[in-house]
């Protein structure tokens, strides 16, 4: 792993005054960053599909307030919980413990987030749409941390990251989605930061390290081979290759991208196929049938997969990939009986869990196919994840204690960063694609979700 520090020198002809030293220190800590307006980025559709803030209707104002409250809560938690330290600063914690009124800092799998469910994407898109300096500062710190500490830069697991744990590198589960280049592309292209460029380049051949990780190894009579999932493994490779190709125009990575898209398009059910494939190092994905015991379908769409896919489709002008996404976004929301009918009985029992995680790809499908029923379904699931009849508190913090100085200590008792990152990201993207399908009033929102079972409420 890595931790990079910067040293900036200022040479003066005389002894530096205190004011000059403070000015210099402030400039080093907060160097100027050239940015365009949010409207300019949005007009060029920089970094995929994301919305500008609008508060023309009651429901839009509610969603924008929730997005603002969500970010402000995490910004304040960084200070309140002292999420600092050489190896920790920039990351946030994974799961809150309402009994102890603290984050589960001491429980493996519930401590540091390590990019799980892409809080990086949520924060960077939130910055692009708001232009807020404080958002940039938090997102920058996360990119600097995650691009250094959370993955292996060389060695047998080069380009592979470590899943969340009490220590960032402590989990035995090593995955490419933790380290994929897409986490940091926005920061790199906004600043040209050379160290981030190096870190992204360190991931370009992460697929070649998979043979060294036991979890991805299989054996048959011919020897060992690698098996990967369509997401988040293949999607992470695509992110790495896309970034390397757009920076270098190296055709090697473009061919690996095109090979995989071709392979998936020839599978019987497109992106729903598998979801695991035998993988060859030229990017070839070998379909080996359907796995009805797989629990991994939601991992295709909650680890940045849709964002990688649709940026890639736009970059390449790839109609095949656009069609694959449009079909899969609708397929995810079908009932098990409908899936069984569509696949001639081959896909039925496999869980397509967390339907609200699929809001972005569902919104993409509804937008491109003009499917109003699907659009309504997407909003139902996304809204009901945060609110339900009788509970519209959302991300409003509550006071759990006051200290000797009468300072209030705040919490959101049910919060998980998995939920925060995915709800923030999916709301930002769905507002762009399906704003017209959102009810204007909160009464309309209540009517939309009143028949929802409620089992996805605050679930992540």
Outline where the language-model segments fall.
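Catalytic cores of extracellular degradative/oxidative enzymes
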Residues: 1-457
């Amino acid at each position: 792993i890595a931790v990079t520090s910067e040293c900036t020198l200022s040479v003066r002809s005389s002894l530096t005054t205190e004011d000059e030293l403070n000015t210099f220190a402030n400039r080093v800590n907060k160097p100027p960053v050239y940015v365009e307006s949010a409207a300019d980025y949005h007009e060029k559709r920089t970094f995929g599909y994301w919305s500008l803030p609008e508060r023309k209707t009651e429901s839009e104002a509610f969603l924008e307030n929730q997005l603002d409250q969500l970010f402000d809560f995490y910004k304040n938690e960084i200070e309140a919980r002292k999420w600092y330290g050489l190896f920790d600063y920039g990351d946030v914690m994974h799961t809150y413990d309402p009994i102890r009124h603290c984050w589960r800092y001491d429980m493996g799998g519930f401590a540091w987030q390590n990019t799980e469910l892409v809080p990086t994407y949520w924060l960077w898109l939130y910055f692009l749409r708001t232009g807020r300096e404080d958002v940039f500062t938090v997102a920058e710190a996360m990119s600097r941390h995650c691009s250094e500490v959370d993955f292996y830069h060389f060695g047998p697991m080069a380009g592979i990251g470590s899943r969340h744990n009490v220590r960032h590198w402590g989990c035995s589960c090593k995955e490419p989605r933790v380290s994929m280049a897409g986490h940091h592309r926005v920061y790199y292209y906004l600043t040209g930061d050379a160290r981030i460029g190096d870190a992204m380049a360190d991931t370009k051949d992460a697929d070649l390290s998979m043979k060294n990780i036991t979890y991805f190894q299989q054996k048959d009579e011919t020897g060992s081979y690698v098996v990967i999932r369509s997401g988040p493994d293949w999607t992470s490779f695509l992110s790495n290759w896309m970034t390397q190709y757009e920076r270098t125009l190296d055709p090697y990575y473009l061919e690996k991208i095109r090979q995989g898209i071709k392979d998936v398009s020839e599978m019987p059910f497109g992106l729903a196929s598998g979801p695991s494939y035998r993988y060859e190092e030229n990017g070839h994905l070998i379909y080996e049938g359907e796995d009805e015991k797989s629990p991994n379908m939601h991992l295709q769409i909650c680890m940045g997969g849709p964002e990688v896919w649709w940026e890639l489709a736009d970059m390449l002008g790839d109609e095949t990939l656009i069609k694959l996404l449009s079909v899969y976004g609708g397929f995810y929301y079908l009932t098990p009986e409908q899936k069984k009918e569509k696949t001639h009985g081959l896909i039925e029992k496999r869980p397509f869990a967390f339907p609200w995680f699929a809001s972005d790809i569902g919104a993409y499908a509804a937008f491109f196919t003009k499917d109003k029923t699907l659009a309504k379904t997407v909003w139902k699931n996304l809204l009901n994840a945060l609110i339900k009849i009788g509970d519209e508190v959302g991300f409003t913090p509550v006071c759990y204690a006051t200290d000797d100085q009468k300072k209030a200590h705040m919490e959101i008792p049910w919060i998980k960063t998995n939920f925060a990152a995915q709800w923030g990201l999916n709301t930002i993207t769905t507002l762009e694609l399906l704003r017209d399908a959102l009810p204007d009033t909160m009464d309309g929102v209540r009517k939309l979700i009143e028949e929802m079972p409620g089992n996805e409420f605050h679930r992540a």
